[in-house]
Each structure stands twice: as structure tokens, then as C-alpha cells.
């Protein structure tokens, strides 16, 4: 079969709606082609149905040697470490940055600029990875991230820092999903769960140690090193990939410039990018900077809704040339994995941000100590990401881990929501471990699922859809958690400690709470703070539970080539 738009020869099952298990036994595909007369076809309604065709692409694929794969994994680990570090390293540096630039009003934009561009551009990188060389698109994304980091480190003012964060976020949009695609091009399917588990575990570690490293740089060197650290690590990543990763040839090598622009779905991007920016700004400003009924918040949500409908219409119209082809969204493995990623990461991000806050405010520890006390959850996530990845490779099936992960995580999250001022060490350590086991078992399985059920030509788009949902889930529920916490804290202080200045408590933050409130009012203020944080934990419990439906719709496809 020939792709008319590019003139590139495609094998059966590649780009024709067939869902492909990249490491199935020879010549075996799962037929998920759309059938207009029976919508259930294309969803692989019978998980035992198999169709034999002549396709041995996986068996003829040449993967890098073991030592080359090791070098590639080192480079990807460094890139993912930098990426995760950049999301949290500023937490302890912001006070000194605000003091140096006299920019307290800009503090919110230091995180938002990075988050907005990352979320808005993630899907666009899916098209780039689909039609151009994965290696060179990835290196360009890495270059953008490095340029943004350099600007942040060298900037003389607050505006430069915001611009640098936006540029770095643009690059980060393609790094994590690109790392997963490089793994897919570098190892057979049965080895990918372990490798993606390593990357996912490292991401969790870097997210939590970020504030610790940021504090060390800020106190002993300069806050600028929070960004300069990315430069040598990124350089090593780029060098290793150039030397050891061959990459894939661009599928547009025979296409004209006009055809390439058509494939990039510029109209869809023009609808989607501002839509994401609108909803994230509305969630960040709503209930904090402006009340929810403010005209600006209502306008942002309205524009988001209109643009989202327009984007959906463009995707339906463009079909295979769309950023998100409807054929893939109709595939239950894709939308199930996307829903699972959205919900589980939404739950995880709330605990990543608010559990250290509980330690700092209720237990009265420093930011560094809170990071250490958060290690039980982090280590559990890392260890069980790797263990579950290894077990998937050995047993063949990822679906059982996707089913048990939200159940364990929901139990752990529920127990964490019971934390009180007098909770002992055994409680908060044990609850964290249980929750971390659940998250670790499930966090990377959606990537394995889409890579095990889609044709090679669909891997970039499928992977990026899942990564986008994971990113946007964290972005949205970071704001949701903040709103729940702040609104509940204001109500609690009004009823339990009415003489405490609530606005001053919010501005002081968790570490300064005990210095802001007088000793006679401190117990009541701490009770109000504890209740507000655990209210945010309830949101995390709900999202962990909501991840389960995404797991239940997944096919039982084996990465070892068997299907139940």
C-alpha cells in the first residue's frame, strides 16, 4: 500500500487502521480497522481474534547492540532527569529570585510559562515525530530546552526569566515522549517495559529531589545554577544520541514542502494551542487571582470550549492528516491508556506538591527535611516502576498491573487523607509506601500498552497522545488541588481561628506558618491547615479511583507475542 500524501510505500497494517502488536509472533496482527456498519469493529471486541497477514517487520528490525543501548539509555536518563528537575527545582529558589528582581507579582509566571508551552505543544510533536526523523526532532527539542535554560540562567531581569521558561517548556514538550519513542526504536517490545520503568522512576526521583537541589544551589552557589545544570547534562545527551542512536528515516523524505505542511495540521494547531492556554490560565487564576464568577475567567472557559469544539471538527475533517486521527481515538487501547494516564498522574501530582507541604506545616520541618520525609513514596514509585516493568517483560501482560495499580494507589491515598497533627512516623511512612507501590505499578504501563497495540507508523502519535494526557492531567489538577486547598484553608481559618489573618498565612507559605501565627493561635491554625491539605488529598483519592475504568477497557495483548 502507498501513502498517497507522501508517496512512501507502507506495509500491510501500517497506516490502514490495523492495530499492530510490535512483537507478536510472525505474521500476526490484531484487526482493529474501522467498520462503518459495526463501530465495535476496530475496537478488537473479541480479544482472542487474530488475523494472519504477511508482515514480519518486527522480526527484521535491527536493534542497537547492548553497549549502544546502554549509552542511549544513559543519554535518555540524563534528559528525563533534567526535564523532571526543571518542573520542581525552582520551588526553593523563587524567594531569592523574587527578591533580586523585585518581581513578587511575576512569581506565578515562572512556573506557568513553562507549563503552558509544554502542555500546548506536546501533541504537535506527535506529528513531527510521525513524519520526520525521531533522532533529529528530538535533538531540536533538546536544543530548545537548552537555549531556554541558558536564557533563564543568564537573564538580567524577570521578563527574560519568563521568556526563557517558555522556550524551555517548548523543548520539554518533545523530550519525554521522544524518549519513549527512542526506547521503542532501540529495544524489542518485551524489553521496553523495564526500560520505560527506569525512565519513569527516574522522573519521579528528579521531581522530588528538585527542591533539595534547588535549595543547595541557591544557598551555596546561585539560583542561576538551577538552570545552568541542564547545559552539561543536555550536551552529553545530545552527543551520545548523535553517536549511538541511528534513529528512523523521515517518512516525508519523498514528500513536497506543501505535502509536509499539510501533514502537520496547522489549522488544528491554531485551534488547539490557544485552547490549552485558555483553560490553564483559567484554572490558575480562578479562585485565587480572580473569583470564579469574574468575567475574565468566564471568558477564558468560553473561548476554551469554542476552540476545543473547533479542534474536534478539524480532526474529524482531516481524518488521517489530523493531529489526533479519529481512528486512534476510537481505539480502546489508546483512549483507555490516555484516561488511565490522565487520572493516575493527576493523583500523583497532588501528593508530589501537597505532601511536602503537610510535613513543613504540620510537622514543622524545613523544605529539605520534607523532601527526605517524602522519600518513602518516591522510592516505592521508583522501585515498583522497575519491578513491574521487569515483570511485564517476563510475563508478557501489562493489563493486570494497570488494574491493580489504581486499586492500591486509591487505598494508599485514602490512608494518607487520614493524616492528622498527631500522626506518628509509622503512619505517614507506611501510607506513602502503599501509595507509591500503586503508582509505580501503573505509571508507565500506558506507554507499553500503546506501543504493544499500534502499528509502528502510529507509535509516535499514540505515544504522544498518552504523554499529553499525562501532562495535562498533572497541570489541571495541580491547579485544582491549589484551589481546593486555598479555599478550604480560608473557610477553616474563618471558623476555627477567625482572628488569624488568612491572607497573610497564605502568603507566608508552609515553612513560615509557625513564625506568622502567634503561639496561642497556632494550634487552631495548624488544625485548619491540616484539614485544608487533606481536602486536597481527597481529590487525589478520587482521581486514583477514576483511573480504574481506563485499565478495565484495555485489551490483553502480550508483549511476548501471545494474546489471551
UniProtKB/Swiss-Prot annotation:
Region of interest: Disordered: 26-59
Gene deletion effect: Does not affect the production of astellolides.
Keyword set includes Transmembrane helix: yes
Subcellular location field: Membrane
GO function term, MF aspect, one: transmembrane transporter activity
Lipid bilayer topology: Multi-pass membrane protein
Protein keywords: Glycoprotein, Membrane, Transmembrane, Transmembrane helix, Transport
InterPro entries, per the entry: MFS (IPR011701), MFS_dom (IPR020846), MFS_trans_sf (IPR036259)
Induction line: Expression is regulated by the secondary metabolite regulator cclA.
Membrane-crossing segments per the record: 69-89, 106-126, 143-163, 197-217, 225-245, 266-286, 297-317, 339-359, 375-395, 396-416, 461-481, 537-557
Polar residues bias locations: 43-53
Broad class of the protein's primary localization: membrane
GO cellular component: plasma membrane
Residues listed as glycosylation sites in the UniProt record: 23, 220, 425
Function statement: MFS-type transporter; part of the gene cluster that mediates the biosynthesis of astellolides, drimane-type sesquiterpene esters that show antimicrobial, anti-inflammatory, and anti-tumor activities. Seems not to be involved in astellolides translocation.
UniProt similarity note: Belongs to the major facilitator superfamily. TCR/Tet family.
Xref: PANTHER family: MAJOR FACILITATOR SUPERFAMILY, MFS EFFLUX TRANSPORTER INPD-RELATED
Protein's UniProt name: MFS-type transporter astH
Amino acid at each position: 500500500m502507498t501513502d498517497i500524501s507522501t508517496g512512501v510505500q507502507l506495509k500491510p497494517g501500517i497506516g490502514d487502521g490495523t492495530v499492530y502488536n510490535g512483537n507478536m509472533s510472525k505474521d500476526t496482527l490484531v484487526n482493529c480497522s474501522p467498520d462503518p456498519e459495526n463501530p465495535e469493529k476496530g475496537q478488537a471486541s473479541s480479544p482472542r481474534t487474530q488475523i494472519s497477514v504477511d508482515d514480519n517487520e518486527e522480526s527484521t528490525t535491527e536493534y542497537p547492540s547492548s553497549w549502544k543501548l546502554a549509552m542511549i539509555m544513559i543519554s535518555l536518563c540524563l534528559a528525563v532527569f533534567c526535564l523532571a528537575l526543571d518542573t520542581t527545582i525552582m520551588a526553593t529558589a523563587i524567594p531569592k529570585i523574587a527578591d533580586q528582581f523585585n518581581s513578587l507579582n511575576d512569581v506565578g509566571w515562572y512556573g506557568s510559562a513553562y507549563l503552558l508551552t509544554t502542555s500546548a505543544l506536546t501533541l504537535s510533536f506527535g506529528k513531527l515525530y510521525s513524519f520526520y526523523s525521531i533522532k533529529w526532532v528530538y535533538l531540536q527539542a533538546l536544543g530548545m530546552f537548552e537555549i531556554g535554560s541558558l536564557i533563564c540562567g543568564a537573564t538580567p531581569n524577570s521578563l527574560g526569566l519568563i521568556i526563557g521558561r517558555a522556550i524551555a517548556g517548548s523543548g520539554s514538550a518533545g523530550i519525554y515522549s521522544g524518549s519513549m519513542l527512542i526506547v521503542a526504536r532501540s529495544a524489542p517490545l518485551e524489553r521496553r517495559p523495564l526500560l520505560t520503568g527506569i525512565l519513569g522512576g527516574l522522573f519521579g526521583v528528579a521531581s522530588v529531589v528538585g527542591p533539595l537541589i534547588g535549595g543547595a544551589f541557591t544557598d551555596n552557589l546561585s539560583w542561576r545554577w538551577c538552570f545552568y545544570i541542564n547545559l552539561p547534562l543536555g550536551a552529553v545527551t545530545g552527543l551520545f544520541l548523535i553517536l549511538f542512536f541511528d534513529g528512523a528515516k523521515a517518512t516525508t523524505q519523498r514528500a513536497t514542502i506543501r505535502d509536509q505542511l499539510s501533514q502537520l495540521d496547522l489549522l488544528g494547531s491554531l485551534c488547539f494551542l490557544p485552547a490549552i492556554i485558555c483553560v490553564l490560565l483559567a484554572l490558575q487564576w480562578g479562585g485565587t487571582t480572580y473569583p470564579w464568577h469574574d468575567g475574565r475567567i468566564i471568558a477564558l472557559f468560553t473561548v476554551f470550549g469554542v476552540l476545543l469544539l473547533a479542534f474536534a471538527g478539524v480532526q474529524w475533517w482531516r481524518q488521517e492528516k489530523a493531529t489526533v486521527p479519529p481512528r486512534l481515538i476510537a481505539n480502546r487501547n489508546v483512549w483507555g491508556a490516555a484516561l488511565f494516564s490522565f487520572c493516575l498522574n493527576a493523583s500523583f501530582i497532588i501528593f508530589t506538591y501537597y505532601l511536602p507541604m503537610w510535613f513543613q506545616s504540620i510537622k514543622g520541618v524545613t523544605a529539605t527535611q520534607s523532601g527526605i520525609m517524602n522519600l518513602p513514596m518516591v522510592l516505592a514509585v521508583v522501585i515498583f516502576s522497575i519491578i513491574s516493568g521487569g515483570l511485564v517483560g517476563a510475563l508478557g501482560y501489562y493489563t493486570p498491573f494497570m488494574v491493580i495499580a489504581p486499586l492500591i494507589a486509591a487505598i494508599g491515598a485514602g490512608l494518607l487523607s487520614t493524616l492528622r497533627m498527631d500522626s506518628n512516623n509509622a503512619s505517614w511512612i507506611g501510607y506513602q509506601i502503599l501509595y507509591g507501590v500503586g503508582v509505580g505499578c501503573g505509571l508507565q504501563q500506558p506507554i507499553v500498552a500503546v506501543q504493544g497495540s499500534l502499528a509502528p507508523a502510529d507509535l509516535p502519535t499514540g505515544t504522544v497522545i498518552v504523554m499529553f494526557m499525562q501532562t495535562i492531567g498533572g497541570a489541571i489538577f495541580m491547579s485544582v488541588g491549589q484551589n481546593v486547598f486555598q479555599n478550604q484553608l480560608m473557610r477553616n481559618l474563618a471558623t476555627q481561628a477567625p482572628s488569624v489573618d488568612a491572607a497573610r498565612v497564605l502568603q507566608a507559605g508552609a515553612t513560615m506558618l509557625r513564625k506568622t501565627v502567634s503561639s496561642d493561635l497556632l494550634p487552631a491554625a495548624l488544625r485548619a491547615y491540616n484539614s485544608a491539605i487533606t481536602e486536597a488529598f481527597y481529590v487525589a483519592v478520587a482521581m486514583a479511583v477514576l483511573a480504574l475504568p481506563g485499565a478495565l477497557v484495555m485489551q490483553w495483548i502480550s508483549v511476548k507475542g501471545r494474546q489471551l
